[in-house]
């Protein structure tokens, strides 16, 4: 596959040989070796022809029977949020915490290291995994930290819990009205409990000490290291500014301009930060982006989360039939913003979990007319409860999707038994139905909502197995190669980057990963247990699990 190099051609910077190369090109080509030069794939072929290209300065990576695939493209993640969670003084997740009292103990321990009045942040709490089966309140946190404001962020990012000191700092009282698109939870006397729902969480964020570019840059570098460890070479940051506002953009540009961020970033600015959008005249994308960072998309959040009962459903929640969730923007306003962004040249990515929200998003996109030729590839994020009729409309209108496939494993049991009931739950992330209609879609982990590993997401798409070991909608499973494409070439398509990344083809970026085994050849149940052994970006080995075997690199 590929012509032998002529003698005058410069030696490649990298040669990879001795294993299996899954190119994921249109023909499903396989090879045993490849060469990269100047950051791009230069040759693909057999061991003998590729080895002959190596020169004195060539890095030679011996696969020793392992498998190379294109670098994973994460089509929906939150690197700043992820990095802040990694650096946070309180890990509020489950595991390690079984009860709210365990989280309170961690807050108490952290408070010993903070001066009076300093903010203590925690991330990843999940009420659905706690034995208490509820959100913490200020009454749980106050004894652990009476002098320090505390803010715990839910694993979904759709809720926060503040202690009394934090509520005082921002001035939230019984008289504070609920903000548009959010709610302040209150007790029977009307006093805030500390739980802040959806946009209400932004009220506390505004009172916290501002996070400057340096702090956010450090968080991004923490996330960057974890991405490389898991074979992620490109990330769609779907919500730049959600954590640090405009300072996030400054942090990205600072890092990428200095070459200190190795993962390639395709950014979607949070819509509230775009000048002119509220007035219907948004600024257009800035074409001047530093190498490794592109931002020509805007993120809008239409509803909340199913497990938080804020995802907007056409039929009520199984556990509370009168509850339908909430829209964070009214449908008419959502459509108005979509139209204004499209006219200004932006790609639009709208978060939609509940089917009522998905209806509103499709309506907004459908009003734009035929999408052919614009190249903007407007998207629905998560698209969790899409019905068959909605998938028909998505196909008709050229609407793409990024499916949060790991919902099946992490929350599938509760979706079936608590939130959605068996019939709706078996259809979450309907990949097979979407694929049968030719809908373009990627797969994602929404980190830090779920752990990074794309191999786990690929397994979820193939196995449709919940955390209790039960199958959930096995008819919506897809095959291994299709799932691999959902984390590579099909994810690249969502950002309009399929011509430069997502498959191993001559001329494309040399973004590659080495897997311990061929995921298309092992028992599907083992896919999530495979390891990423090395990550290559632009032809450079940027991470490896263990030293390359003797003679394997020089």
Language-model region placement:
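Acidic (Asp/Glu)-rich catalytic clusters
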Residues: 255-258, 283-293, 370-373, 394-398
């Amino acid at each position: 596959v590929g012509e032998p190099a002529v003698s005058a051609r410069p030696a490649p910077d990298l040669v990879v040989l001795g294993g299996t190369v899954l190119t994921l090109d249109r023909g499903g080509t396989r090879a045993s070796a490849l060469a990269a030069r100047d950051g791009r794939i230069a040759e693909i072929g057999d061991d003998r022809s590729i080895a002959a290209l190596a020169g004195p300065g060539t890095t030679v990576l011996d696969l020793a029977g392992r498998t190379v695939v294109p670098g994973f493209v994460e089509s929906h993640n939150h690197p700043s949020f992820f990095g802040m969670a990694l650096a946070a003084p309180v890990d509020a997740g489950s595991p390690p915490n079984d009860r709210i009292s365990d989280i309170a103990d961690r807050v108490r321990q952290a408070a010993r290291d903070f001066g009076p009045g300093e903010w203590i942040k925690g991330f990843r709490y999940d009420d659905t995994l706690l034995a208490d089966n509820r959100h913490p309140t200020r009454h749980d946190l106050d004894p652990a930290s009476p002098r320090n404001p505390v803010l715990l962020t839910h694993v979904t990012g759709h809720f926060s819990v503040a202690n009394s000191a934090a509520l005082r700092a921002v001035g939230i009282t019984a008289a504070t009205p609920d903000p548009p698109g959010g709610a302040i939870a209150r007790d029977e006397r009307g006093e805030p409990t500390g739980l802040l729902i959806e946009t209400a969480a932004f009220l506390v964020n505004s009172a916290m000490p501002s996070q400057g570019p340096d702090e956010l840059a450090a968080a991004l570098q923490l996330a960057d290291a974890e991405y490389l460890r898991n074979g992620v070479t490109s990330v769609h940051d779907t919500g730049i500014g959600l954590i640090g506002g405009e300072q996030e953009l400054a942090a990205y540009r600072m890092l990428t301009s200095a070459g200190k961020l190795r993962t390639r970033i395709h950014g979607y600015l949070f819509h509230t930060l775009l000048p002119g959008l509220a007035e219907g005249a948004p600024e257009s994308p800035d074409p001047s982006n530093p190498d490794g960072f592109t931002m020509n998309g805007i993120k809008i959040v239409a509803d909340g989360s199913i497990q938080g009962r804020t995802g907007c459903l056409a039929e009520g929640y199984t556990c509370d039939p009168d509850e339908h969730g909430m829209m964070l923007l009214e449908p008419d306003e959502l459509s108005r913003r979509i139209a204004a962004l499209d006219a200004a040249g932006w790609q639009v990515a709208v978060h939609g979990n509940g089917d009522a929200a998905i209806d509103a998003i499709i309506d907004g996109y459908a009003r734009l007319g035929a999408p052919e030729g614009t190249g903007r590839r407007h998207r629905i994020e998560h698209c969790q409860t899409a019905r068959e009729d909605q998938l028909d409309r998505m196909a008709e209108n050229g609407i793409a999707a990024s499916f949060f496939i790991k919902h099946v494993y992490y929350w599938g049991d509760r979706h079936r038994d608590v939130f959605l009931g068996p019939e709706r739950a078996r259809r979450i992330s309907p990949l097979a139905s979407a694929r049968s209609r030719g809908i373009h879609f990627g797969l994602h982990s929404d980190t830090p909502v779920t752990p990074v590993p794309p191999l786990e997401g690929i397994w979820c798409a193939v196995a449709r197995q919940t955390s209790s070991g039960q199958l959930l909608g096995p008819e919506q499973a897809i095959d291994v190669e299709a799932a691999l494409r959902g984390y590579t070439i099909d994810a690249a398509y969502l950002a309009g980057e399929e011509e430069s990344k997502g498959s191993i083809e001559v001329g494309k970026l040399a973004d590659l990963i080495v897997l311990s085994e061929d995921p298309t050849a092992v028992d599907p149940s083992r896919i999530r247990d495979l390891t990423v052994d090395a990550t290559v970006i632009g032809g450079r080995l940027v991470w490896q699990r263990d030293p390359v075997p003797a003679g394997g690199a020089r």
